[in-house]
From Swiss-Prot:
This is CMP-N-acetylneuraminate-poly-alpha-2,8-sialyltransferase. Its EC number is 2.4.3.-. InterPro entries: Glyco_trans_29 (IPR001675), Glycosyltr_29_Sialyltrsf (IPR050943), GT29-like_sf (IPR038578), Sialyl_trans (IPR012163). Pathway: Protein modification; protein glycosylation. The gene is ST8SIA4. Its main location: Golgi. The lineage of its organism: Eukaryota, Metazoa, Chordata, Craniata, Vertebrata.
Length: 359
Protein backbone atom coordinates (compact mmCIF):
# COMPACT_ATOMS: atom_id res chain seq x y z
CA UNK A 1 0.00 0.00 0.00
CA UNK A 2 2.81 2.37 0.92
CA UNK A 3 4.56 1.66 -2.40
CA UNK A 4 1.37 2.48 -4.31
CA UNK A 5 1.03 5.86 -2.53
CA UNK A 6 4.68 6.55 -3.24
CA UNK A 7 4.22 5.86 -6.96
CA UNK A 8 1.14 8.11 -7.06
CA UNK A 9 3.06 10.89 -5.32
CA UNK A 10 5.96 10.63 -7.78
CA UNK A 11 3.53 10.57 -10.72
CA UNK A 12 1.67 13.66 -9.45
CA UNK A 13 4.90 15.59 -8.91
CA UNK A 14 6.11 14.63 -12.40
CA UNK A 15 2.88 15.83 -14.00
CA UNK A 16 3.07 19.14 -12.13
CA UNK A 17 6.67 19.64 -13.22
CA UNK A 18 5.75 18.93 -16.86
CA UNK A 19 2.79 21.33 -16.64
CA UNK A 20 4.82 24.22 -15.22
CA UNK A 21 7.72 23.59 -17.59
CA UNK A 22 5.34 23.63 -20.56
CA UNK A 23 3.87 26.95 -19.42
CA UNK A 24 7.36 28.39 -18.99
CA UNK A 25 8.37 27.30 -22.50
CA UNK A 26 5.14 28.71 -23.96
CA UNK A 27 5.74 32.07 -22.25
CA UNK A 28 9.32 32.14 -23.53
CA UNK A 29 8.28 31.31 -27.09
CA UNK A 30 5.50 33.89 -27.04
CA UNK A 31 7.95 36.55 -25.84
CA UNK A 32 10.49 35.62 -28.52
CA UNK A 33 7.95 35.52 -31.32
CA UNK A 34 6.46 38.92 -30.54
CA UNK A 35 9.83 40.62 -30.81
CA UNK A 36 10.68 42.45 -34.01
CA UNK A 37 13.36 41.13 -36.28
CA UNK A 38 16.35 43.23 -37.37
CA UNK A 39 15.80 46.94 -37.89
CA UNK A 40 12.04 47.02 -37.59
CA UNK A 41 11.01 44.22 -39.92
CA UNK A 42 7.99 42.15 -39.07
CA UNK A 43 7.35 39.15 -36.88
CA UNK A 44 4.02 37.55 -36.02
CA UNK A 45 3.18 36.04 -32.67
CA UNK A 46 1.96 32.47 -32.47
CA UNK A 47 -1.26 33.67 -30.86
CA UNK A 48 -2.00 35.72 -33.96
CA UNK A 49 -1.18 32.85 -36.29
CA UNK A 50 -3.42 30.40 -34.42
CA UNK A 51 -6.42 32.74 -34.24
CA UNK A 52 -6.98 33.08 -37.99
CA UNK A 53 -10.73 32.52 -37.78
CA UNK A 54 -11.13 35.34 -35.25
CA UNK A 55 -10.62 37.86 -38.02
CA UNK A 56 -14.08 36.93 -39.27
CA UNK A 57 -15.83 36.57 -35.90
CA UNK A 58 -14.43 39.76 -34.39
CA UNK A 59 -14.80 42.35 -37.12
CA UNK A 60 -13.45 45.69 -36.04
CA UNK A 61 -11.63 44.30 -33.02
CA UNK A 62 -7.93 44.57 -32.31
CA UNK A 63 -7.43 41.20 -34.01
CA UNK A 64 -7.75 43.00 -37.36
CA UNK A 65 -6.70 46.61 -37.44
CA UNK A 66 -6.89 47.86 -40.99
CA UNK A 67 -7.48 51.39 -42.18
CA UNK A 68 -7.14 52.56 -45.77
CA UNK A 69 -8.10 56.18 -45.16
CA UNK A 70 -5.11 58.21 -44.13
CA UNK A 71 -2.66 55.52 -45.23
CA UNK A 72 0.80 56.89 -46.02
CA UNK A 73 3.83 55.27 -47.59
CA UNK A 74 6.75 54.62 -45.25
CA UNK A 75 9.55 55.05 -47.79
CA UNK A 76 12.34 54.20 -45.37
CA UNK A 77 10.68 50.88 -44.50
CA UNK A 78 10.12 50.14 -48.20
CA UNK A 79 13.83 50.64 -48.86
CA UNK A 80 14.76 48.54 -45.84
CA UNK A 81 12.58 45.64 -47.00
CA UNK A 82 13.99 45.87 -50.53
CA UNK A 83 17.53 45.80 -49.18
CA UNK A 84 16.84 42.78 -46.97
CA UNK A 85 15.09 40.83 -49.74
CA UNK A 86 18.11 41.45 -51.97
CA UNK A 87 20.14 39.41 -49.49
CA UNK A 88 18.09 36.39 -50.54
CA UNK A 89 17.23 37.04 -54.19
CA UNK A 90 17.45 39.59 -56.94
CA UNK A 91 14.05 39.75 -58.62
CA UNK A 92 15.54 41.33 -61.72
CA UNK A 93 17.61 38.19 -62.24
CA UNK A 94 15.48 35.48 -60.59
CA UNK A 95 12.19 36.44 -62.19
CA UNK A 96 13.20 34.31 -65.20
CA UNK A 97 15.90 32.06 -66.52
CA UNK A 98 17.35 33.25 -69.83
CA UNK A 99 18.44 31.55 -73.04
CA UNK A 100 22.04 31.27 -71.96
CA UNK A 101 20.95 29.30 -68.87
CA UNK A 102 20.22 26.15 -70.87
CA UNK A 103 20.43 24.57 -74.27
CA UNK A 104 17.86 22.25 -75.90
CA UNK A 105 18.12 18.75 -74.51
CA UNK A 106 19.42 19.79 -71.11
CA UNK A 107 17.96 17.83 -68.21
CA UNK A 108 16.99 19.66 -65.02
CA UNK A 109 15.44 18.55 -61.73
CA UNK A 110 12.07 19.92 -60.68
CA UNK A 111 12.36 22.48 -57.91
CA UNK A 112 9.89 20.80 -55.55
CA UNK A 113 10.50 17.21 -56.64
CA UNK A 114 14.21 16.62 -57.05
CA UNK A 115 13.70 12.97 -57.98
CA UNK A 116 11.89 13.92 -61.21
CA UNK A 117 13.50 15.57 -64.22
CA UNK A 118 12.50 17.71 -67.18
CA UNK A 119 14.07 17.95 -70.63
CA UNK A 120 14.45 21.44 -72.06
CA UNK A 121 12.59 21.24 -75.38
CA UNK A 122 13.34 23.31 -78.48
CA UNK A 123 10.03 25.18 -78.09
CA UNK A 124 10.75 26.03 -74.46
CA UNK A 125 14.28 27.14 -75.23
CA UNK A 126 13.14 29.32 -78.12
CA UNK A 127 10.74 31.16 -75.80
CA UNK A 128 13.28 31.85 -73.06
CA UNK A 129 14.09 35.57 -72.96
CA UNK A 130 17.53 36.77 -74.02
CA UNK A 131 17.66 39.02 -70.94
CA UNK A 132 15.48 39.40 -67.88
CA UNK A 133 12.11 40.96 -68.78
CA UNK A 134 12.48 43.18 -65.70
CA UNK A 135 16.03 44.33 -66.40
CA UNK A 136 16.48 48.02 -65.53
CA UNK A 137 12.74 48.52 -65.05
CA UNK A 138 11.46 50.75 -62.26
CA UNK A 139 7.96 52.03 -61.48
CA UNK A 140 6.54 54.63 -59.14
CA UNK A 141 3.39 52.67 -58.30
CA UNK A 142 2.49 49.01 -58.89
CA UNK A 143 -0.68 47.01 -58.35
CA UNK A 144 -0.56 43.33 -57.45
CA UNK A 145 -4.03 41.93 -58.11
CA UNK A 146 -5.08 38.73 -56.37
CA UNK A 147 -8.17 36.78 -57.36
CA UNK A 148 -10.33 36.77 -54.23
CA UNK A 149 -14.06 37.34 -54.56
CA UNK A 150 -13.57 40.32 -52.24
CA UNK A 151 -13.02 42.26 -55.48
CA UNK A 152 -16.64 41.82 -56.60
CA UNK A 153 -18.58 45.09 -56.28
CA UNK A 154 -15.39 46.84 -55.15
CA UNK A 155 -15.36 49.29 -58.08
CA UNK A 156 -11.57 49.15 -57.99
CA UNK A 157 -11.08 48.78 -61.75
CA UNK A 158 -10.12 52.38 -62.52
CA UNK A 159 -7.83 52.64 -59.52
CA UNK A 160 -6.03 49.42 -60.45
CA UNK A 161 -5.56 50.56 -64.04
CA UNK A 162 -4.18 53.91 -62.88
CA UNK A 163 -0.98 52.28 -61.58
CA UNK A 164 2.20 52.37 -63.64
CA UNK A 165 2.60 48.59 -63.59
CA UNK A 166 -0.09 45.95 -62.96
CA UNK A 167 0.66 42.37 -61.94
CA UNK A 168 -2.10 39.75 -62.18
CA UNK A 169 -2.27 36.14 -61.07
CA UNK A 170 -3.14 32.93 -62.90
CA UNK A 171 -4.41 34.44 -66.15
CA UNK A 172 -7.61 35.54 -64.44
CA UNK A 173 -10.30 36.94 -66.77
CA UNK A 174 -10.67 40.70 -66.68
CA UNK A 175 -12.95 42.04 -69.44
CA UNK A 176 -16.24 40.86 -67.93
CA UNK A 177 -15.17 42.11 -64.48
CA UNK A 178 -13.46 45.32 -65.60
CA UNK A 179 -15.39 47.64 -63.26
CA UNK A 180 -14.05 45.77 -60.25
CA UNK A 181 -10.65 44.46 -61.38
CA UNK A 182 -9.61 46.70 -64.30
CA UNK A 183 -8.06 45.43 -67.52
CA UNK A 184 -4.48 46.68 -67.55
CA UNK A 185 -2.08 43.73 -67.42
CA UNK A 186 1.68 44.19 -67.58
CA UNK A 187 2.82 41.01 -65.86
CA UNK A 188 0.59 37.91 -65.66
CA UNK A 189 1.33 34.62 -63.96
CA UNK A 190 -0.05 31.33 -65.28
CA UNK A 191 0.23 28.04 -63.42
CA UNK A 192 0.21 25.09 -65.86
CA UNK A 193 -2.95 23.80 -64.11
CA UNK A 194 -4.88 26.75 -65.59
CA UNK A 195 -4.82 24.97 -68.97
CA UNK A 196 -6.95 22.16 -67.56
CA UNK A 197 -9.14 24.18 -65.23
CA UNK A 198 -9.98 27.18 -67.42
CA UNK A 199 -9.37 25.95 -70.96
CA UNK A 200 -10.55 22.33 -70.87
CA UNK A 201 -7.08 20.91 -71.32
CA UNK A 202 -7.18 22.08 -74.96
CA UNK A 203 -9.42 19.11 -75.78
CA UNK A 204 -10.95 20.84 -78.78
CA UNK A 205 -10.33 23.71 -81.14
CA UNK A 206 -12.66 26.11 -79.32
CA UNK A 207 -10.65 25.66 -76.10
CA UNK A 208 -7.45 26.45 -77.95
CA UNK A 209 -9.01 29.46 -79.69
CA UNK A 210 -10.25 30.78 -76.35
CA UNK A 211 -6.75 30.51 -74.93
CA UNK A 212 -5.10 32.16 -77.95
CA UNK A 213 -7.64 34.99 -77.77
CA UNK A 214 -6.87 35.51 -74.07
CA UNK A 215 -3.12 35.70 -74.73
CA UNK A 216 -3.57 37.97 -77.74
CA UNK A 217 -5.12 40.54 -75.38
CA UNK A 218 -1.85 40.69 -73.45
CA UNK A 219 0.11 42.11 -76.39
CA UNK A 220 3.73 42.46 -75.23
CA UNK A 221 3.02 41.87 -71.54
CA UNK A 222 5.09 39.36 -69.59
CA UNK A 223 3.52 35.90 -69.23
CA UNK A 224 5.19 34.22 -66.24
CA UNK A 225 4.94 30.42 -66.31
CA UNK A 226 6.33 28.38 -63.37
CA UNK A 227 7.36 25.47 -65.57
CA UNK A 228 10.00 23.92 -63.34
CA UNK A 229 8.14 23.52 -60.03
CA UNK A 230 6.63 20.02 -60.03
CA UNK A 231 6.12 17.08 -62.35
CA UNK A 232 2.69 16.84 -63.95
CA UNK A 233 2.27 20.12 -65.79
CA UNK A 234 4.97 19.64 -68.43
CA UNK A 235 2.56 18.68 -71.22
CA UNK A 236 0.46 21.77 -70.51
CA UNK A 237 3.56 23.96 -70.65
CA UNK A 238 4.54 22.43 -73.99
CA UNK A 239 1.04 22.93 -75.41
CA UNK A 240 1.10 26.57 -74.31
CA UNK A 241 4.54 27.10 -75.83
CA UNK A 242 3.47 25.49 -79.10
CA UNK A 243 0.37 27.70 -79.38
CA UNK A 244 2.37 30.85 -78.68
CA UNK A 245 4.86 29.97 -81.41
CA UNK A 246 2.26 28.75 -83.91
CA UNK A 247 0.12 31.88 -83.57
CA UNK A 248 3.11 34.23 -83.32
CA UNK A 249 1.71 35.86 -80.19
CA UNK A 250 3.52 38.98 -79.00
CA UNK A 251 3.41 38.03 -75.34
CA UNK A 252 6.84 37.89 -73.67
CA UNK A 253 7.29 34.60 -71.87
CA UNK A 254 9.24 34.21 -68.63
CA UNK A 255 10.04 31.11 -66.58
CA UNK A 256 11.15 31.62 -62.95
CA UNK A 257 14.63 30.63 -61.87
CA UNK A 258 15.18 27.32 -60.13
CA UNK A 259 16.14 29.05 -56.89
CA UNK A 260 13.35 31.61 -56.67
CA UNK A 261 10.73 29.85 -54.55
CA UNK A 262 13.26 28.64 -51.98
CA UNK A 263 14.86 32.10 -51.79
CA UNK A 264 11.48 33.76 -51.22
CA UNK A 265 10.54 31.22 -48.57
CA UNK A 266 13.92 31.73 -46.91
CA UNK A 267 13.34 35.47 -46.63
CA UNK A 268 9.97 35.08 -44.95
CA UNK A 269 11.12 32.29 -42.65
CA UNK A 270 13.99 34.49 -41.51
CA UNK A 271 11.39 37.11 -40.61
CA UNK A 272 9.45 34.60 -38.49
CA UNK A 273 6.65 34.03 -41.01
CA UNK A 274 6.47 30.20 -41.09
CA UNK A 275 5.03 29.62 -44.56
CA UNK A 276 5.23 26.19 -46.18
CA UNK A 277 5.28 27.43 -49.77
CA UNK A 278 4.65 31.05 -50.78
CA UNK A 279 1.43 31.66 -52.66
CA UNK A 280 1.56 33.36 -56.04
CA UNK A 281 0.37 36.59 -54.45
CA UNK A 282 3.13 36.63 -51.84
CA UNK A 283 5.69 35.72 -54.52
CA UNK A 284 4.56 38.64 -56.67
CA UNK A 285 4.71 41.10 -53.78
CA UNK A 286 8.21 39.91 -52.89
CA UNK A 287 9.38 40.31 -56.50
CA UNK A 288 7.69 43.70 -56.85
CA UNK A 289 9.71 45.17 -53.98
CA UNK A 290 12.69 45.17 -56.34
CA UNK A 291 11.23 47.42 -59.02
CA UNK A 292 8.26 49.23 -57.44
CA UNK A 293 8.55 52.27 -55.19
CA UNK A 294 4.97 51.90 -53.94
CA UNK A 295 3.00 48.64 -53.98
CA UNK A 296 -0.79 48.39 -53.77
CA UNK A 297 -2.49 45.03 -53.22
CA UNK A 298 -6.03 44.17 -54.31
CA UNK A 299 -7.99 40.93 -54.22
CA UNK A 300 -6.16 39.49 -51.22
CA UNK A 301 -8.70 38.00 -48.81
CA UNK A 302 -8.24 34.34 -47.77
CA UNK A 303 -11.45 33.94 -45.78
CA UNK A 304 -14.92 32.62 -46.71
CA UNK A 305 -16.67 35.71 -45.29
CA UNK A 306 -15.94 39.41 -45.16
CA UNK A 307 -15.89 41.44 -41.94
CA UNK A 308 -19.65 41.92 -42.19
CA UNK A 309 -20.30 38.19 -42.43
CA UNK A 310 -21.09 38.24 -46.15
CA UNK A 311 -19.93 35.20 -48.14
CA UNK A 312 -16.83 35.77 -50.27
CA UNK A 313 -15.97 33.57 -53.24
CA UNK A 314 -12.49 32.05 -53.39
CA UNK A 315 -12.05 33.43 -56.93
CA UNK A 316 -14.05 36.36 -58.24
CA UNK A 317 -14.52 34.60 -61.59
CA UNK A 318 -15.50 31.00 -60.72
CA UNK A 319 -17.07 28.79 -58.05
CA UNK A 320 -13.94 26.93 -56.97
CA UNK A 321 -13.90 26.02 -53.27
CA UNK A 322 -10.83 26.18 -51.05
CA UNK A 323 -10.11 25.17 -47.46
CA UNK A 324 -8.06 28.10 -46.21
CA UNK A 325 -7.11 26.48 -42.91
CA UNK A 326 -6.41 22.96 -44.15
CA UNK A 327 -3.05 21.52 -43.10
CA UNK A 328 -3.00 19.70 -46.44
CA UNK A 329 -2.75 22.98 -48.34
CA UNK A 330 0.74 23.90 -49.60
CA UNK A 331 0.03 27.53 -48.65
CA UNK A 332 -0.76 29.36 -45.41
CA UNK A 333 -2.83 32.14 -46.90
CA UNK A 334 -4.41 33.50 -43.69
CA UNK A 335 -0.93 33.83 -42.19
CA UNK A 336 0.34 35.51 -45.36
CA UNK A 337 -2.59 37.90 -45.26
CA UNK A 338 -1.93 38.92 -41.68
CA UNK A 339 1.71 39.48 -42.55
CA UNK A 340 0.71 41.76 -45.43
CA UNK A 341 -1.75 43.54 -43.15
CA UNK A 342 1.06 44.25 -40.67
CA UNK A 343 3.07 45.73 -43.54
CA UNK A 344 0.05 47.80 -44.60
CA UNK A 345 -0.30 49.25 -41.11
CA UNK A 346 3.39 50.15 -41.15
CA UNK A 347 3.19 51.86 -44.53
CA UNK A 348 5.29 49.34 -46.46
CA UNK A 349 2.41 48.57 -48.84
CA UNK A 350 -1.25 49.44 -49.25
CA UNK A 351 -3.74 46.60 -48.88
CA UNK A 352 -7.24 47.34 -50.17
CA UNK A 353 -9.97 44.96 -49.01
CA UNK A 354 -13.11 47.04 -49.50
CA UNK A 355 -14.57 49.43 -52.02
CA UNK A 356 -12.24 51.81 -53.79
CA UNK A 357 -12.76 55.53 -53.50
CA UNK A 358 -13.93 56.95 -56.82
CA UNK A 359 -11.26 59.09 -58.42
Amino acid sequence: MRSIRKRWTICTISLLLIFYKTKEIARTEEHQETQLIGDGELSLSRSLVNSSDKIIRKAGSSIFQHNVEGWKINSSLVLEIRKNILRFLDAERDVSVVKSSFKPGDVIHYVLDRRRTLNISHDLHSLLPEVSPMKNRRFKTCAVVGNSGILLDSECGKEIDSHNFVIRCNLAPVVEFAADVGTKSDFITMNPSVVQRAFGGFRNESDREKFVHRLSMLNDSVLWIPAFMVKGGEKHVEWVNALILKNKLKVRTAYPSLRLIHAVRGYWLTNKVPIKRPSTGLLMYTLATRFCDEIHLYGFWPFPKDLNGKAVKYHYYDDLKYRYFSNASPHRMPLEFKTLNVLHNRGALKLTTGKCVKQ
